[in-house]
Amino acid sequence: MAKKIVGFIKLQIPAGKANPSPPVGPALGQRGLNIMEFCKAFNAQTQGMEPGLPVPVVITAYADKSFTFVMKTPPATVLIKKAAKVDKGSSKPHTDKVGSITRAQAEEIAKTKMPDLTAADLDAAVRTIAGSARSMGITVEGV
């Protein structure tokens, strides 16, 4: 028989920097999960990633106080800002442009995000990324 699920916890944690302080500690502590065990497992799995890159994670908590977690790809907005070399998007995205990315950069981001996107092929994924970039005030050349 499968274990009884008591809840899901969604967090965004910087790669390799999970520690028991908020938001990780309180979120896991409420469900009675072993915080240090999660931190060690998460940091081990994000070892190969760029340090500090926010990684969305979905933790499944079970009734016997055990857990499993699934890591997602970093948010598209973070990858777009990194590619465009800007700190934040525009406050008026359709009038003030803060940067630009090329189609090649958009394709690279789309390849990274492909497991989490609903796009059928790479071209559709690139258009999705281009739309996200435009809504941040970043132009996409060649799309």
UniProtKB/Swiss-Prot annotation:
Keywords: Methylation, Ribonucleoprotein, Ribosomal protein, RNA-binding, rRNA-binding. One of its GO terms (molecular function) is large ribosomal subunit rRNA binding. One or more lysine residues are methylated. It comes from the Bacteria. One of its GO terms (biological process) is translation. GO terms for cellular component: cytosolic large ribosomal subunit. Pfam families: Ribosomal_L11, Ribosomal_L11_N. The keyword rRNA-binding applies. Forms part of the ribosomal stalk which helps the ribosome interact with GTP-bound translation factors. Part of the ribosomal stalk of the 50S ribosomal subunit. Interacts with L10 and the large rRNA to form the base of the stalk. L10 forms an elongated spine to which L12 dimers bind in a sequential fashion forming a multimeric L10(L12)X complex. PANTHER family: 60S RIBOSOMAL PROTEIN L12, LARGE RIBOSOMAL SUBUNIT PROTEIN UL11M. Belongs to the universal ribosomal protein uL11 family. This is Large ribosomal subunit protein uL11. It comes from Burkholderia multivorans (strain ATCC 17616 / 249). The gene is rplK.
